[in-house]
Amino acid sequence: MNTEATHDQNEAQTTGVRLRNAREQLGLSQQAVAERLCLKVSTVRDIEEDKAPSDLASTFLRGYIRSYARLVHVPEEELLPGLEKQAPLRAAKVAPMQSFSLGKRRKKRDGWLMSFTWLVLFVVVGLTGAWWWQNHKAQQEEITTMADQSTAELNADKDSGQSVPLDTGAATSQDTTPAQTAPAPATPVDSTAATQTPAPTAAATQNTVVAPSQANVDTAATSAAPAATETPSALPTSQAGVAAPAADPNALVMNFTADCWLEVTDATGKKLFSGMQRKDGNLNLTGQAPYKLKIGAPAAVQIQYQGKPVDLSRFIRTNQVARLTLNAEPTPAQ
């Protein structure tokens, strides 16, 4: 009768109550049990209160309860009915295995994506090359057009310049005539020769200028000698009065190492030069600053402005037509 009553009493007690009673009979505290089982005191308390922590898997909880039962000498078989209620076993969720075809589809999709990426890359590279080639071709056409224009302008200048020698010759003849006739009045004139030449008109006046000189030569050779000596003495005086022009501080000096097309315009819009310069040539231009320059081959020219070299490296690196403006810098006071 006593055995059956004890068995019924054990069945009425839960797992946590039985473990707590066994611990108290052995005189152990919750701290001591936790240290022996290497558990937290809160975990031991939850087991004795028949609580299942939400963050603890049922498999670990059943293992802790069995270790606790062995520690307090409680048979595990007597705790099995309570374990099923307190820590029931749950079926593990197993993800279904993916078929091999899914991996193949993913690999195929990655292959298409890679092919599309390469296609886009090739298109971008092709467009970039086409853009560069168009710019290069446009620059070459612009240089050719400018060279043709400069050639046409040079031909026009040559055609218009054929009349220049005639004008200069006429001007020199007009200049030399007063120069030749100017010394004539300075020569001594006899009164008899002067009375022989009438002066009613301008033509007669010219004859009177020539006649005294001839009469002077015929009558007295000694009077021609002072006139001859006076003429050379006047030449140094005229030469001394001519001074060399001062160098323009805003002058452009250019030296060419190869054939190059060039156009230079000053502030007034006047074209100081437009045409082709040959290798080993040099050019010195003066005008009103600032100057606007257009150079077909920047690497073929060296420019000095106000005694300083002009940097054209940025145009040489890009191999393009140089368009730049040179501003006048104030010169320091002397």
From Swiss-Prot:
It is a single-pass type II membrane protein. Residues 19-71 form the HTH cro/C1-type domain. The keyword Hydrolase does not apply. Residues 155-241 are annotated as: Disordered. One of its GO terms (cellular component) is plasma membrane. Coiled coil: none annotated. It is found in: Cell inner membrane. Its main location: membrane. Keywords: Cell inner membrane, Cell membrane, Cell shape, DNA-binding, Membrane, Signal-anchor, Transmembrane, Transmembrane helix. GO terms for biological process: regulation of cell shape. It holds the Pfam family RodZ_C. Residues 133-334 are periplasmic. The helix-turn-helix (HTH) motif in the cytoplasmic domain of the N-terminus is involved in the formation of spirals to maintain the rigid rod shape. As this protein is anchored in the cytoplasmic membrane, the HTH motif may contribute to protein-protein interactions to form the RodZ helix, which is localized beneath the cytoplasmic membrane. The C-terminal domain may be critical for determination of the rod shape by probably interacting with enzymes required for synthesis of the peptidoglycan layer, including PBPs in the periplasm. This is Cytoskeleton protein RodZ. It comes from Salmonella typhimurium (strain LT2 / SGSC1412 / ATCC 700720). The lineage of its organism: Bacteria, Pseudomonadati, Pseudomonadota, Gammaproteobacteria, Enterobacterales.
